[in-house]
């Protein structure tokens, strides 16, 4: 039995019961559920101004100090944003350490290069390697959505944030975001 299986909340509110108080006080139980809950959610990254003119990369942690997944916002020439893994697919080195302007993404460990879409481009001394590159050599792309100028990212979101955004827009449409 999984650690989380012992907790059940009936989806019918008439039959639902409150979780035991130990659930809220036990650090290990919190650690067991935090990734299950938050890795499946959308998180606010920032305002689009974090990528000003002459800046096309912005490294960040998914939930800094909580779920530390190194991610990278990348802005293309048309101002479109993508969220990519900021971890090299070769030796798990961080690729971009500071926001800035780059023409491609280069891992400083072994020189592996990726384009701004995260596609593998090259690696020194691997030109003659058989069955290389493979699809898994490219950087993983994560879901990204905007609410006006605000950027949200999800690792593996289990709901569509557009449903949330539509309700927010209903309430704040007068703000002209």
Model-based region annotation:
Residues 91:
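Active-site gating/metal-coordination segments in enzymes
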Residues 75, 85-87:
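Residue-level signal for short segments within beta-strands and strand-turn junctions
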Residues 1-80, 101, 115-177:
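Rieske [2Fe-2S] iron-sulfur-binding subdomain
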Residues 82-85, 104:
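Residues immediately within or flanking Cys/His clusters that coordinate Zn2+
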Residues 88, 107:
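Short cysteine-rich clusters marking metal-coordination/redox-active sites
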Residues 94-97, 114-116:
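Short, non-ligating residues that shape and space the ligands of small metal-coordination modules
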């Amino acid at each position: 039995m999984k650690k989380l299986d012992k907790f059940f909340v009936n989806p019918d509110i008439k039959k639902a019961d409150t979780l035991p108080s130990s659930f809220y006080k036990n650090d290990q139980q919190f650690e067991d559920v935090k990734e299950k809950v938050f890795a499946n959610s959308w998180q606010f990254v920032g305002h689009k101004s974090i990528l000003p003119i002459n800046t096309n990369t912005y490294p960040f942690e998914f939930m800094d100090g909580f779920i530390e997944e190194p991610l990278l916002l990348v802005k293309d020439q048309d101002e479109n944003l993508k969220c990519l893994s900021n971890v090299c697919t070769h030796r798990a080195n961080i690729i971009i350490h500071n926001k800035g302007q780059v023409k491609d993404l280069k891992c400083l460990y072994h020189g592996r290069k990726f384009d701004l879409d995260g596609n593998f481009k090259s690696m020194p001394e691997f030109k003659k390697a058989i069955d290389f590159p493979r699809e898994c050599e490219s950087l993983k792309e994560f879901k990204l959505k905007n609410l006006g100028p605000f950027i949200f990212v999800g690792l593996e979101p289990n709901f569509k944030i557009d449903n949330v955004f539509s309700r927010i827009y209903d309430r704040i449409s007068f703000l002209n975001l």
